[in-house]
């Protein structure tokens, strides 16, 4: 099994830059690919990302716009939005060596196809080994070397373990798993729950309401996970409960801050600040997938209704509070 001495990170945004720094700290030879010419030039000249001001890029990290050059690495971290992963994976297929791990670092479900990230990779880049990296991790924390733990999953246990070892550093601790579906499902589901938590905070409904929402949101995550074959220990782990807890508690989470703005009465366009949170795209897909399996997800239903304009925030909250009483699961 390869030790993955060379790693390419595709995407020079905040999270991509943070992971490139992490791989460099772990002793890997790192190439950072950025498709936008302006952003790439800034990375080269300023040695920092526009999205992480004040965090210097390690001198050993090579920045490139040449996808073929990046594709020569022994493992590639795909740090691109969930809704554009397909095009990137398709472009990589003719460039990568057989059995090259492509590790999705986005948390979402593809709109229109209901595909999870590793399913997209398997479909578009059959030469690759699909993997997923997820867990409670903010780019600013990781970039600055603050202690962080995540999960890396691949169906091949040896690959998952080798990838975890390759990214392991003094401050970044990856656990490995073969429950690919569970890991990516947790990350996608928490996006929607974080919007709900943000709405509660923005509406100033109090700490009790926020705790209740987060807890019942976790119940929905577990229900959905069971229906789609996730392991219970994964849902209770970093990529499930860990990520949910983090993103439902701080405006550092884009989904939470988006929800806060909605809770304060801002429009979706204003709340987005020019870039919609991933949970906006995940909510309707999550609901469709839950309905297909007969999974009850009232919080997700309420969020989807708010986002598509069928319900106002107050009506959605009232609807949740007036549901028939039931035994706690």
Curated annotation (Swiss-Prot):
Identify the InterPro entries for this entry.
Answer: 6-PGluconate_DH-like_C_sf, 6PGD_dom2, G3P_DH_NAD-dep, G3P_DH_NAD-dep_C, G3P_DH_NAD-dep_N, NAD(P)-bd_dom_sf
User: Entry's Pfam families?
Assistant: NAD_Gly3P_dh_C (PF07479), NAD_Gly3P_dh_N (PF01210)
Output one GO BP term.
glycerol-3-phosphate biosynthetic process
Active-site residues per Swiss-Prot or TrEMBL entry:
190
**Localisation per UniProt entry:** Cytoplasm
Q: Which reaction does it catalyse?
A: sn-glycerol 3-phosphate + NAD(+) = dihydroxyacetone phosphate + NADH + H(+); sn-glycerol 3-phosphate + NADP(+) = dihydroxyacetone phosphate + NADPH + H(+)
Query: Sorted alphabetically, which SUPFAM superfamilies does this protein's record hold?
Result: 6-phosphogluconate dehydrogenase C-terminal domain-like, NAD(P)-binding Rossmann-fold domains
A GO CC annotation given for this chain: cytosol
Annotated pathway: Membrane lipid metabolism; glycerophospholipid metabolism
The EC number of this protein is: 1.1.1.94
Detail which positions bind sn-glycerol 3-phosphate. Answer: 107, 135, 137, 190, 243, 253-255
Gene3D superfamilies reported in the protein's UniProt record: N-(1-d-carboxylethyl)-l-norvaline Dehydrogenase, domain 2, NAD(P)-binding Rossmann-like Domain
Which PROSITE patterns does the record cross-reference, listed alphabetically? NAD_G3PDH
A single Gene Ontology molecular function, please?
Answer: glycerol-3-phosphate dehydrogenase [NAD(P)+] activity
Q: Known NCBIfam families for this protein? A: PRK00094.1-2, PRK00094.1-4
Family assignment? Belongs to the NAD-dependent glycerol-3-phosphate dehydrogenase family.
The record, for PANTHER family, names: GLYCEROL-3-PHOSPHATE DEHYDROGENASE (PTHR11728), GLYCEROL-3-PHOSPHATE DEHYDROGENASE [NAD(+)] 2, CHLOROPLASTIC (PTHR11728:SF1)
Q: What is this protein called?
A: Glycerol-3-phosphate dehydrogenase [NAD(P)+]
Q: Which organism is it from?
A: Rhodopseudomonas palustris (strain HaA2)
Organism classification: Bacteria, Pseudomonadati, Pseudomonadota, Alphaproteobacteria, Hyphomicrobiales
């Amino acid at each position: 099994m390869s030790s993955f001495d060379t790693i390419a990170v595709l995407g020079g945004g905040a999270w991509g830059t943070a992971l490139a720094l992490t791989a460099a700290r772990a002793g890997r030879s790192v190439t950072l690919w950025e498709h936008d010419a302006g952003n790439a030039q800034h990375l080269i000249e300023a040695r920092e990302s526009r999205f992480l001001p004040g965090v210097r890029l390690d001198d050993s990290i090579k920045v490139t716009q040449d996808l073929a050059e990046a594709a020569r690495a022994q493992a590639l971290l795909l740090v691109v939005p969930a809704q554009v992963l397909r095009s990137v994976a398709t472009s990589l297929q003719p460039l990568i060596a057989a059995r090259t791990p492509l590790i999705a670092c986005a948390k979402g479900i593809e709109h229109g196809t209901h595909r999870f990230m590793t399913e997209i990779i398997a479909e578009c880049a059959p030469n690759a080994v699909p993997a997923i990296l997820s867990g409670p991790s903010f780019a600013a924390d990781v970039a600055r070397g603050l202690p962080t733990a995540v999960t890396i999953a691949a169906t091949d246990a040896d690959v998952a373990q080798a990838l975890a070892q390759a990214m392991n550093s003094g401050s970044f601790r990856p656990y490995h798993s073969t429950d690919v579906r569970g890991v990516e499902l947790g990350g996608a589901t928490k996006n929607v729950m974080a919007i709900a938590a943000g709405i509660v905070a923005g509406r100033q409904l109090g700490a009790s309401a926020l705790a209740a929402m987060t807890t019942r949101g976790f119940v929905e995550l577990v229900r959905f996970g069971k229906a789609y074959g996730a392991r219970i220990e994964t849902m209770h782990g970093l990529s499930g409960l860990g990520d949910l807890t983090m993103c439902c508690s701080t405006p550092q989470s884009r989904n939470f801050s988006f929800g806060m703005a909605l809770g304060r009465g801002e429009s979706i366009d204003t709340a987005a600040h020019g870039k919609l949170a991933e949970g906006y795209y995940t909510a309707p897909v999550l609901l469709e997938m839950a309905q297909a399996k007969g999974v009850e997800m009232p919080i997700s239903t309420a969020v989807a209704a708010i986002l598509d304009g069928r319900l106002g925030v107050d009506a959605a909250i009232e609807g949740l509070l007036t549901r028939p009483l039931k035994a706690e699961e």
